[in-house]
Curated annotation (Swiss-Prot):
Subunit structure: Homodimer.
GO molecular function per UniProt: acetate kinase activity; ATP binding; magnesium ion binding
Cofactor requirements of the protein: Mg(2+); Mn(2+)
Pathway: Metabolic intermediate biosynthesis; acetyl-CoA biosynthesis; acetyl-CoA from acetate: step 1/2
Chain residues that bind Mg(2+): 7, 385
Residues engaged in binding substrate: 92
Cofactor binding note: Mg(2+). Can also accept Mn(2+).
Source organism per UniProt: Helicobacter acinonychis (strain Sheeba)
Lineage of producing organism: Bacteria, Pseudomonadati, Campylobacterota, Epsilonproteobacteria, Campylobacterales
Enzyme Commission code(s) on record: 2.7.2.1
Protein known as: Acetate kinase
Length: 400
């Protein structure tokens, strides 16, 4: 069985083609800067006999043009003989709202719901839907499955997902906390339980997905019971360009003081804040280098980021009662030892203690970063959202 996973962003397409007999990728690729003057195309074959790679810089008009390039290169590179022979396509869809608590086979009703939910994810759901529509038009017989970022968090209790706003706002407009990065949190939690030989339905963990977008999840008995993101991905941790938790009155105050419209203020909070807002850069590598050289703003940004993560760990330890593991994943969580060290520093009395030599040089794959005989295991686990989407796609396909 061959499954193609598509992850369409506002100006990008990320994809992986899997052979589901062994859950191994046959090819992967990334198309970036769609709609800009010079776009980028990168496709890599993972076939044992042929590890060829294609890199191009060219104008890519829109997502449909990008998807045509994906189809063309998968066949031209000999990765697949016929695109129509793909068994299914799994789509990452960011917002599933109250409607979708699990992956679903796409039909007209599902497409209408994804479009309706675009008001909650205006940057993501419309392009996710564009990918679905492209496949439906070009290859109508290929089954498509939508896998929702929010679905894993559908198990949160109402006292965790509700905002203390007039209840009618929830009833009329579904204003509540949904959470995101669910596919990643789910994947690394399953991998951790397997690694620690704990039955997943008895596994308690705090998962830290730390990248340019970042979130924490509290997982109890294998289910999400709380997470840091809310109605949108703006809530929670300090991120690359997003502010995370702030006093809501700040929005009105900025608008008045700086003479900004609501739209302009929201742009500041989403694209000009977070690490970038504090030190002018959202690249963790640059920030770490600058901080080591004594740059005060870079040091402040780093400390603020780590402190916010640490506060969420403490809160979720209380929510869970028992914690088997703390799991670092995502670009920053996997690759920046200094951030992991700063987050775990001072938590020894809670049973969290890093083994510094291992943390500094963890190697590849799943790594136990904790000191021997500590109460809570600290793990570094590379996430694989595409594989998790492929696995969920396969399960839905087998049911139908």
């Amino acid at each position: 069985m061959e499954i193609l996973v598509l992850n369409l962003g506002s100006s990008s397409i990320k994809f992986k083609l899997f052979d589901m007999k062994e859950n191994k990728p046959l090819a992967s690729g990334l198309i970036e800067r769609i709609g800009e003057e010079v776009g980028q195309l990168k496709i890599q074959s993972h076939l044992h006999h042929d590890k060829q790679e294609v890199k191009k810089q060219l104008f890519i008009k829109d997502h449909a043009s990008g998807l045509l390039m994906v189809r063309e290169h998968l066949t031209k590179m000999g990765i697949i003989k016929d695109f129509d022979k793909i068994d299914a396509i799994g789509h990452r869809v960011v917002q599933g709202g109250d409607k979708f608590h699990a992956p679903v086979l796409v039909d007209e009703k599902v497409m209408q719901e994804i479009e309706r939910l675009s008001i909650l994810a205006p940057l993501h759901n419309p392009v996710n839907l564009a990918g679905i529509k492209f496949v439906k038009t070009a290859h109508p017989h290929i089954p498509q499955i939508a896998v929702f970022d929010t679905a894993f968090h559908a198990t949160m209790p109402d006292f965790a997902y509700m905002y203390a706003l007039p209840y009618e706002l929830y009833e009329k407009y579904q204003i509540r906390r949904y959470g995101f990065h669910g596919t990643s949190h789910h994947y690394v939690a399953k991998e951790a339980a397997k690694y620690l030989h704990i039955p997943y339905h008895k596994f308690n963990a705090i998962t830290l997905h730390l990248g340019n977008g970042a979130s924490v999840a509290a997982i109890k008995d294998g289910k999400s019971v709380d997470t840091s993101m809310g109605l949108t991905p703006l809530e929670g941790l300090i991120m690359g360009t997003r502010c995370g938790d702030i006093d809501p009155t700040v929005v009105e105050y900025i608008a008045q003081c700086a003479n900004k419209s609501l739209e302009e203020v929201m742009k500041i909070l989403n694209y000009e804040s977070g690490l970038k807002g504090i030190c002018g850069d959202n690249d963790a590598r640059n920030i770490e280098t600058r901080a080591k050289k004594g740059d005060k703003q870079a040091k402040l940004a780093f400390e603020m980021c780590a402190y916010r993560i640490k506060k969420h760990i403490g809160a979720y330890m209380v929510a869970l009662g028992r914690v088997d593991a703390i799991i670092f994943t995502g670009g920053m969580g996997e690759n920046y030892p200094a951030l992991r060290e700063s987050v775990c520093e001072g938590l020894e009395k809670l049973g969290i203690a890093l083994h510094k030599p291992t943390n500094d040089n963890p190697g590849s794959g799943i790594v136990d970063l904790s000191q021997p005989n500590t109460k809570i295991q600290v793990l570094r686990i590379p996430t694989d959202e595409e594989l998790e989407i492929a696995l969920q796609t396969k399960r839905v396909l087998e049911k139908h």
